[in-house]
């Protein structure tokens, strides 16, 4: 069994840590408020934005799963660059088998509905993308092997924004705009799967099988919830929705043997709706 460190042990990190612990791995989690770390993860109370305390020895795998506390350049720099620098420095006397850096598919600049793979160019067109790409470069140039996973939009328990908007009658969708998503359980499953693979590439896209027109998702949810009047809008050129208009391919990660529990939004949201 392996010794695993999860830096940034929030919702996704705790889900991963608990799952790994249940499989017999020894898992440590870093969080500013260690009381929020779910047992049986071993808590480490520390701030990644400051110098870190001495870390557990003989770590095999590192997961960097940090979220910026707010949407501005300083927050993104601290979360994806400064924090990672501090972590790599704290690991200077160790030789983990791999560092996994959790990034975002938002670094892909394509916005005309194109098919996007790991070979497609990524561009730092805004501060968030620039900082994420800077963090990716740091991870891949660390003194131990690194792999970047660019997740699409994550949904699942506790991440029910679309459902809430539809139920409240506040939902509107952008016409002819594709969106890409992944259930949080598949995020965990995918990371566990990759951790067990000895030979990995440096970059994987983490999304389900089905890039989907945003309005199709909203309309399907509205039908399941017996809600009408989903407002359709034309996307503006610089809107966030328009910037996300691409069709991400998961062919590379599926080629590693991973099988999605929720291959599309229908399976994932159906289960969420049943739990309401």
Give the ranges of each region predicted by the language model.
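C-terminal amphipathic/interface module of NAD(P)-dependent oxidoreductases
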Residues: 241-276
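Glycine/proline-rich active-site loop of Rossmann-fold NAD(P)-dependent oxidoreductases
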Residues: 133, 142, 154-168, 193-204
